[in-house]
From Swiss-Prot:
UniProt GO BP: translation
Organism per entry: Anaeromyxobacter sp. (strain Fw109-5)
NCBIfam families cross-referenced by the UniProt entry: PRK00010.1
Similarity remark: Belongs to the universal ribosomal protein uL5 family.
Any GO molecular function: structural constituent of ribosome
Keyword RNA-binding listed: yes
Protein name as annotated: Large ribosomal subunit protein uL5
InterPro entries in the record: Ribosomal_uL5, Ribosomal_uL5_bac-type, Ribosomal_uL5_C, Ribosomal_uL5_CS, Ribosomal_uL5_dom_sf, Ribosomal_uL5_N
Length: 180
């Protein structure tokens, strides 16, 4: 069964975007390409167990096993060696991506303390949107009692939009709560 948000995009949102942006061909309408969830774990240099806990939490949040990112080069000031594990990331595509985006905008973001909406300025000039989450406990899949340390993550939504206006229109139609 296809993701609920994907079906809504194909049935309603794509045609609304075509009218709004003045496209004739449905393939011109912007769509989600992938979502990258990255958790940088600088403190993993001193404590290797943090990586395992974070990998477990990221896989619970995204439904996919994360890849452990390693340091590209040694930095003496940070006590960092080349090849040392310093983070975890997941790239979501297809139905998992739509399901994650749906959970993010409808369940997780409203659980952020003092949430007034996400910044409409965090686009990169090519229609992609990046947002930082300060706590992983906003996701319902995370058991608050088992969390040792509260960690944040970066969520990048990559779209096929050609510019920020198209990307903003797409995310607004998909339900992203932008600040006014």
């Amino acid at each position: 069964m296809a993701a609920r948000l994907r079906e809504r995009y194909e049935k309603e949102i794509r045609s609304e975007l075509m009218k709004e942006l003045g496209f004739a061909n449905p393939m011109q309408a912007p769509k989600l390409e992938k979502i990258v969830v990255n958790m940088g774990l600088g403190e993993a240099i001193n404590n290797g167990k943090i990586i395992d806990a974070s990998v477990e939490q990221l896989s619970a949040i995204t439904g996919q096993k994360p890849v452990v990112t390693k340091a590209r080069k040694s930095i003496a000031n940070f006590k960092l060696r080349q090849g040392q594990s310093i983070g975890a990331m997941v790239t979501l595509r297809g139905d998992r991506m739509y399901e994650f985006f749906d959970r993010l905008v409808s369940i997780a973001l409203p659980r952020v303390r003092d949430f007034k909406g996400v910044s409409p300025k965090a686009f990169d000039g090519k229609g992609n949107y990046t947002l930082g989450v300060r706590e992983q406990i906003i996701f319902p899949e995370i058991n608050y009692d088992k969390v040792e340390k509260i960690k944040g993550m970066n969520i990048t939504v990559v779209t096929t939009a050609r510019n920020d206006e198209e990307g903003r229109a797409l995310l607004r139609h998909l339900g992203m709560p932008f600040r006014q």
